[in-house]
Amino acid sequence: MSGKPQSPENQARQLIVAYQQYQAEAESLVRELGLIQMTAEGLDKAISAIGALSKAAEGQEMLVPIGSGSFAYAKLSSADRVVVNVGGGVSIEKPAEEAMEMLRARRSAISESSKKINEALAKIEQEMARIQAALERLERELQKQGGSEGFVQ
């Protein structure tokens, strides 16, 4: 590659490619944030449910969700122990308070991940705005030179 400056058209092409790459990365991060939000909501529900169970009496009849908005009647046999997923498809029985602490720690980690992804997304959006402005400048420059059909996103 020579030291010769690039033409505005080539600069624009490179900027458009970079913009599209940032756009794809931003879309991926938004999808990841959606998954994180669903996980956070599930953790919040589990923490709330364990809290509610701790106030229930053993033998108390309750409705247990079985999916698709359906419930089954059940009697609580133990309010102080729950079964929690510890990862890798493995679930273990834990004291309710210990399970709540474990779930709160997961929730905290999820919140931190969400914060980092939002920060990365903000940086990408800033870079996309910078590229957009550069493309607009190049487009004006090309129009002054008398030949552009426009390429700003």
From Swiss-Prot:
UniProt xrefs under Gene3D superfamilies: 1.10.287.370
InterPro entries: PFD_alpha_archaea (IPR011599), Prefoldin (IPR009053), Prefoldin_subunit_alpha (IPR004127)
Main location: cytoplasm
Compartment list: Cytoplasm
The entry's keywords: Chaperone, Cytoplasm
Keyword Chaperone: yes
GO molecular-function terms, A-Z: unfolded protein binding
GO cellular component: cytoplasm; prefoldin complex
GO annotation terms (biological process): protein folding
UniProt superkingdom: Archaea
Keyword Chaperone: yes
Subunit structure: Heterohexamer of two alpha and four beta subunits.
Xref: NCBIfam families: prefoldin subunit alpha
Similarity section: Belongs to the prefoldin subunit alpha family.
Protein role: Molecular chaperone capable of stabilizing a range of proteins. Seems to fulfill an ATP-independent, HSP70-like function in archaeal de novo protein folding.
Protein name: Prefoldin subunit alpha
The species this protein was found in: Methanothrix thermoacetophila (strain DSM 6194 / JCM 14653 / NBRC 101360 / PT)
Gene: pfdA
